[in-house]
Design a protein with these regions (language model features):
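Family-specific signature for flavin-dependent thymidylate synthase
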Residues: 1-206
Length: 206
């Protein structure tokens, strides 16, 4: 299956970021002041004054391959991540990723290889349960899982950390899988009703 992402929820907006920045003077928003929000956000982003962008959050549910999983785990500041654990449960769905830019014969080869590993995973897990107990069986049988195996992760960014994630992962030099994930996340944020982060995204050149 393909990697997938869902936007579960969000908090904040361009106004949230602007009011946070203006707390040092006055949070009251006049009509004239409201009109200056795009300019303010652009200045904050370009000058590196990014603390106000920490006041909003974006909450995603993703299903990704192990390589993309590792890319996500490298983002620790302003990011909260929980994920499926093969140590605590048997991964019965056998989700796995096949690169869609490969020749068909290689896609089929990886599909077959991964399916063999998944079958052995379940077989060995059940056998080890008899000799080593369920806990040890789950945490060690997973060594049969391939790098293409997918897990589901609950990921929440504040907007500052999301912008940093996009800078690194929505880049031509990033691995295809994580670049596509970042692009889909960005698309979902842009499609939010009312476009609440329109000027913040423009401030960061998205």
């Amino acid at each position: 299956m393909k990697n997938e992402v869902v936007l579960l929820g969000h908090y904040g907006s361009d106004l949230t970021h602007a009011q946070s920045a203006w707390t040092s003077t006055s949070r009251e928003i006049s009509t004239e002041k409201h009109a200056r929000i795009p300019q303010l956000l652009e200045m904050l982003a370009s000058e590196g004054h990014h603390t106000p962008f920490e006041k909003s959050s974006l909450h995603f549910l993703v299903t990704v391959d192990q390589a993309t999983h590792i890319h996500l785990l490298k983002h620790r500041i302003g990011v909260s991540i929980n994920g499926e654990s093969a140590r605590y449960k048997e991964l019965k769905e056998d989700k796995f990723y096949i690169p869609d830019d490969w020749p068909v014969e290689l896609q089929l080869m990886l599909d077959e290889y991964t399916s063999i590993g998944n079958a052995m995973y379940h077989k060995v897990l059940h056998r080890l349960t008899e000799t080593h107990g369920r806990k040890r069986a789950k945490e060690s049988a997973r060594f049969f899982k391939t790098f293409s195996s997918q897990i589901t992760m609950d990921v929440m960014f504040n907007f500052r950390s999301f912008a940093h994630f996009l800078k690194l992962r929505y880049d031509e030099h990033a691995q295809k899988e994580v670049r596509e994930l970042a692009g889909e996340m960005l698309k979902l944020v842009k499609e939010l009703e009312g476009n609440p982060f329109e000027h913040t995204l423009k401030a960061f050149k998205y």
